[in-house]
Amino acid sequence: MAATLTPEQITEYKGIFEMFDEEGNGLVKTDDLESLMSLIGINPTKRDLANMAKDVDKDKKGTFNCDGFLVLMGIYHEKSKNQDEELRAAFKVFDKEHKGYIEWDTLKYVLMNAGEPLNEHEAELMMKEADKDGDGTIDYEEFVAMMTGESFKLTQ
């Protein structure tokens, strides 16, 4: 799975891994996984972090090696890519005219009528929170942040 990483990513992740390999034995404590991920700019939920720790620490010794970490990062990037594709497809549903943004009225209608519907006040609060640049529309980056609860950069 590490094959899904670019050579640059592999080099970067190996370097960061080595920073946490305090004893120089090729192992990092699973307790350090959150700090390691945070340094990369990934902030998983506690549940995701527990699952990741379980994935990299198969022998339950409380440590993981660089290969396991690279496999984990490959899986993470693959999931991120899949999520991005799903979000792009959803965004296109709302951006029917391919303007690159979603009108407030369109989004408000969807938020109030689809899935677990929000009331008008909740929908407006969510949209105001999502509209980071205050232009009255939701662009793709704002849409992703709203849907995932995370900030998103197109450079990822």
From Swiss-Prot:
Its main location: cytoplasm. GO terms for molecular function: calcium ion binding. Keywords: Calcium, Cytoplasm, Metal-binding, Repeat. Expressed by the venom gland. InterPro entries: CALM/Myosin/TropC-like, EF-hand-dom_pair, EF_Hand_1_Ca_BS, EF_hand_dom. One of its GO terms (cellular component) is cytoplasm. This is Calglandulin.
